[in-house]
A protein has these predicted regions:
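ABC ATPase nucleotide-binding domains
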Residues: 41, 80-242
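The feature captures the beta-strand-to-loop junction immediately N-terminal to the Walker
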Residues: 45-47
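Helix-to-loop junction immediately C-terminal to a conserved catalytic motif
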Residues: 60
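Conserved coupling/switch loops of ABC nucleotide-binding domains, chiefly the family-specific signature
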Residues: 66-69, 119, 219, 251
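Conserved ABC transporter NBD signature motif
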Residues: 68-76
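Non-catalytic connector elements of ABC transporters
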Residues: 247, 257-348
């Protein structure tokens, strides 16, 4: 998880009841309201077609909402064209001009704004240092690696010092190893310059690693907003629990409850759990969310600590994944759960 900013932040962006429909009465964004604080790294996370990129495009001015408003630092920019908005967007395909050098690509926005050539060269040089590509100003995009092209696109988006940088799946074209490296570089850059970043991705790990806060989008609506820790440890719906990492969704029946705890019947077992474990409830029927890595395996012959909540089961399958073992455990009532254990902790 990104460390975020310690200083007091102020709201830089507000989306108020934002709605967008396309042909055939398809609702891409459904009455969404949210805010972003200055200096935050916020991610819009969801599967393809959930509306997250449409949200980003409405903030950038590339789409216009059917209802609602986009407010930047207290100013309504809903109907403003892209060139009048103090935001820049880094597109998924980078959109570099193939016939222009690195210097010309990065400095393009400054030149069309009428900035003198000497000043443009100076600022481009600073950007090349910032993105760790000094001396590459005369190269063409075709002479760069994929990661280098991404950095050039990033520098071009940042050189005009936008209030918000919009990132549309910025690492989707990179292989796994380069993607991890670029995540670290992007976070370092965000920390250096302090500009608000708003990123779209479908990659849960990427969102968890990079974000101060994550907005989970489902079918054009917000499912939950929170820090990576809040969303992982305290999902409010089964969808969030299962979208962010693997989860055991266990049906149970409430026997009794008090304060923030309850006794839940799972098959022939009773568990004392916190309300935060519940991700769905209808009357006394609840769904418990328990992460696979937070279950400890004990042999049936072991002496059990009475302070532990215990359910009995039978190991059905064991999979080796390098640094851990993944167990499938069958429970009463034709149910099963998954358990992940580091190699050196199994049955300890």
């Amino acid at each position: 998880m990104h460390s975020g900013q310690n200083k007091k932040m102020t709201t830089v962006l507000e989306l108020r009841n934002l709605t967008k429909k396309f042909a055939g009465d398809v609702t891409a964004v459904d009455n969404i309201s949210m805010s972003v604080e200055g200096g935050e790294f916020v991610t819009l996370l969801g599967p393809s077609g959930c509306g997250k990129t449409t949200m980003l495009r409405m903030i950038g001015g590339f789409e216009y909402p059917d209802a609602g408003s986009v407010v930047l630092e207290g100013v309504d920019i809903t109907d403003a064209p892209p060139y009048e908005r103090p935001v820049n967007m880094m597109f998924q395909d980078y959109a570099l001009f193939p016939h222009m050098t690195v210097e010309s690509n990065i400095g393009y926005g400054l030149r069309i704004s009428g900035i003198e050539s000497r000043q443009v060269q100076h600022e481009v040089g600073e950007m090349l240092e910032l993105i760790d590509l000094p001396g590459m100003q005369n190269r063409l995009p075709s002479e760069l690696s994929n990661g280098q092209r991404q950095r050039v696109a990033l520098a071009r988006a940042l050189i005009r010092k936008p209030k918000i940088l919009l990132l549309d799946e910025p690492m989707s074209a990179l292989d796994a190893k380069l993607r991890q490296s670029m995540q670290i570089e992007l976070l370092s850059l965000h920390k250096k310059i302090g500009i608000t970043f708003l990123m779209v991705t479908h990659d849960q790990t990427e969102a968890m690693v990079m974000s101060d806060r994550i907005t989970v989008i489902r079918d054009g609506a917000i499912e939950q907003i929170g820090t990576p820790t809040e969303l992982y440890d305290h999902p409010v719906t089964p969808y969030v629990a299962e979208f962010l990492g693997q989860s055991n969704m266990i049906p149970a029946v409430v026997q009794r409850s008090a304060a923030d705890r309850l006794i839940a019947q799972v098959g022939s077992n009773e568990l004392d759990v916190t309300n935060a474990t519940i991700v769905g409830r209808i009357d006394n029927n609840v769904t418990l969310c328990i992460r696979p890595e937070r279950i400890r395996l004990l042999e049936s012959s072991s002496e059990v600590d009475t302070s532990l909540e215990v359910i009995t089961g039978v190991v059905q399958q064991v999979l080796y994944s390098g640094n851990s073992l993944h167990f499938t455990i069958s429970l009463d009532g034709n149910r099963s759960i998954h358990v992940h254990h580091p190699l050196n902790t199994v049955f300890n």
